């Protein structure tokens, strides 16, 4: 309770999440000594610590400056939809969240305080579900300020902890070599959990560990070397290959993940070899598959290293015109506001730090929209300007708009300036156009 109060005082919406999780866990997995008196003490301690922050928040949300005269959901759609709205969530990110949540639930099954962790995970899922629905039902500032969709970050924090504990127990336990190998694979896969394929390996390996350690009939089957061989050949190695394919598709494949995937395959095959020797059986034919996979990984790395270095060099080359632009503006005598290209939160964000890089004020940019969260009255200025600038069709329209609004300079994604302006600076991609009187 004290920690929840401190967290609330530092970051109120995270404090609200924590209170919801602890309350849900208290109801569903009540500690043996947690009677009514202990519960009241905890509530009182939280209220005492969080009261100053709660009073300040209440004051800011009920004052004249807090009145919202616009649709909050439309503001979010204009500013930063994928931070608040389920409609902007990417399918592969949703899939990763669901898979890692499942893996955490299975890992909790292998721990001593299973019910408590299941309650915490259930509370997180319920909060995320509320974050999916509430913005479309209640168009109010507090709903968005709670950032309920961001509770997935708590799951991303809790899930690896539970999985690590369960995997380490499997690795250091008294189980068969195959289960120990699954623990090692699970830990290595966890280092790839942010990649598209990583959660698949985590979920698969932790599920097999749970079946081996908790399921009676399943344990008997997993102890069979023939079953282990089939699992490696038909499930685990194809899952590793899928991770390689997904990394290649996302241009994230280099020597480190290749080494990691190869080690996973080697650990699995090594466990089968150890088990075969223990049982005095022939070596598993899957060793050939492992060697082939390792060779493919190494060949792919060799083919990708040059391409990766070329990609990095190309990114630096593409960034160079912007760097030259802001360096020139920073050292130039030009003063006053700049009209700059608008960034897209889903695409390019090259100009989001222009005012800091160039040390000059801007007429409007995408990043300014964040200020509406703290000062709703700013919406009337920012949204109007943002929509107006976004609607400008070409460079000539931008120059005309700048003249109509007494904007001194315009940065264009062009090497020349339209009539009505003079070019103060230009490079391979950008021009600084000064509005003529």
Predicted regions and their residues:
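Short periplasmic/luminal acceptor-recognition loop of GT-C membrane glycosyltransferases, typified by
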Residues: 303-307, 314-387, 399-417
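Hydrophobic alpha-helical membrane segments of integral membrane proteins
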Residues: 2-3, 16-20
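Short acidic, glycine/proline-enriched helix-loop-strand junctions
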Residues: 417-436
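Transmembrane catalytic cores of multi-pass membrane glycosyltransferases
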Residues: 12-18, 27-160, 164-167, 191-212, ...
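Transmembrane helical bundles and short interhelical boundary loops of multi-pass, membrane-embedded
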Residues: 127, 137, 152, 178-350
């Amino acid at each position: 309770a004290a920690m929840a109060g401190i967290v609330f005082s530092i970051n109120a919406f995270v404090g609200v999440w924590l209170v919801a999780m602890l309350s849900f866990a208290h109801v569903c997995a009540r500690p043996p000594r947690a009677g009514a008196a202990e519960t009241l003490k905890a509530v009182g301690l939280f209220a005492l610590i969080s009261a100053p922050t709660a009073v300040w928040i209440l004051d800011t949300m009920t004052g004249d400056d807090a009145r919202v005269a616009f649709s909050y959901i439309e503001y979010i759609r204009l500013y930063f939809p994928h931070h608040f709205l389920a409609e902007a969530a990417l399918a592969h990110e949703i899939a990763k969240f669901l898979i890692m949540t499942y893996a955490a639930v299975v890992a909790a099954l292998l721990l001593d305080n299973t019910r408590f962790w299941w309650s915490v995970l259930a509370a997180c899922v319920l909060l995320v579900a509320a974050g999916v629905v509430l913005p479309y039902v209640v168009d109010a500032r507090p709903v968005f300020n709670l950032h309920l969709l961001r509770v997935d970050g708590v799951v991303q924090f809790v899930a690896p902890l539970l999985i690590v504990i369960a995997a380490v127990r499997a690795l250091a336990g008294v189980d068969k070599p195959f289960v120990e190998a699954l623990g090692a694979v699970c830990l290595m896969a966890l280092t790839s959990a942010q990649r598209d394929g990583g959660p698949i390996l985590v979920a698969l390996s932790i599920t097999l560990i749970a079946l081996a350690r908790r399921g009676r009939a399943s344990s008997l089957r997993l102890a069979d070397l023939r079953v282990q061989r089939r699992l490696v050949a038909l499930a685990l190695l194809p899952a590793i290959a899928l991770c390689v394919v997904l990394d290649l598709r996302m241009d994230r494949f280099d020597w480190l993940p290749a080494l990691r995937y190869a080690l996973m395959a080697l650990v699995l095959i090594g466990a089968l070899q150890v088990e075969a020797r223990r049982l005095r059986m022939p070596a598993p034919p899957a060793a050939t598959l492992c060697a082939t996979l390792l060779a493919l990984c190494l060949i792919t790395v060799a083919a990708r290293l040059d391409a990766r270095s070329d990609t990095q060099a190309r990114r630096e080359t593409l960034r160079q015109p912007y760097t030259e632009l802001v360096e020139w503006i920073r050292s130039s005598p030009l003063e006053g506001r700049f009209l700059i290209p608008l960034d897209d939160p889903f695409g390019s964000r090259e100009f989001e730090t222009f005012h800091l890089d160039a040390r000059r004020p801007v007429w409007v940019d995408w990043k300014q929209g964040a200020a509406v969260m703290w000062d709703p009255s700013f919406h009337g200025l920012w949204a109007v300007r943002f929509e107006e600038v976004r609607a400008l069709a070409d460079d000539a329209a931008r120059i005309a708009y700048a003249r109509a609004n007494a904007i001194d300079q315009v940065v264009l994604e062009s090497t020349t300036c339209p009539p009505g302006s003079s070019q103060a600076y230009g490079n391979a991609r950008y021009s600084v156009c000064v509005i003529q009187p």
